[in-house]
């Protein structure tokens, strides 16, 4: 009987420790300047950008993203081969202790597939950033119309 109680107590303690690690990761990872590029209403693929900050003293890994406002979301990296821009999926992002990673046009970004509703300039959508420790950090991204130098990065013509 004591063996069962000890085993149960150990399991409970480990579960609490895992939850504490997830809460710590969530409180040390912050998201700034999240935005989604506005696209024509019939577009099924949009792109999101943001800065991911790690205020902790240990490296953190971003393992993926999703959104209740899209069928799916994937982290991609833009690579130019033979003059053609290609979007390649990235399995995860390492954010150094005390560091940050910028997801921006022409580099790392989030591809958002099949919006649940048309998104116009000024609308917001929820993006969820997942970490290796199990944390899920939600952020509201504002839809922004592309302008100036940024106008040339239209994802509807890139190869995935």
What do the PLM-derived regions correspond to, one by one?
Residues 1-6:
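Positively charged n-region of N-terminal signal peptides that target proteins for export
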Residues 10-19:
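Bacterial N-terminal signal peptides
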Residues 20-25:
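Sec/Tat signal peptide C-region and signal peptidase I cleavage site
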Residues 26-160:
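Compact, glycine-rich, soluble single-domain proteins
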